[in-house]
From Swiss-Prot:
Family: Belongs to the bacteriocin class IIA/YGNGV family.
Signal peptide: 1-27
Activity over temperature: Thermostable, retains activity after heating at 100 and 121 degrees Celsius.
GO biological process: defense response to Gram-positive bacterium; killing of cells of another organism
Main location: secreted
Entry's localization field: Secreted
Protein's UniProt name: Bacteriocin enterocin-P
Amino acid sequence: MRKKLFSLALIGIFGLVVTNFGTKVDAATRSYGNGVYCNNSKCWVNWGEAKENIAGIVISGWASGLAGMGH
């Protein structure tokens, strides 16, 4: 659980560092699949997509913790 919390904190810090409120995506933009996008001049976060990914991480961690309680 600590590892997942550390990962979430790291994602949050990274998101705060590279946040740019524009969400325009062009052909030269690279998506990292977690809501973070970068092109040659800047990086930014699509917070709607990032929140979905963070929620998925939290839910899967919670569910795997419940599954491990039976052992």
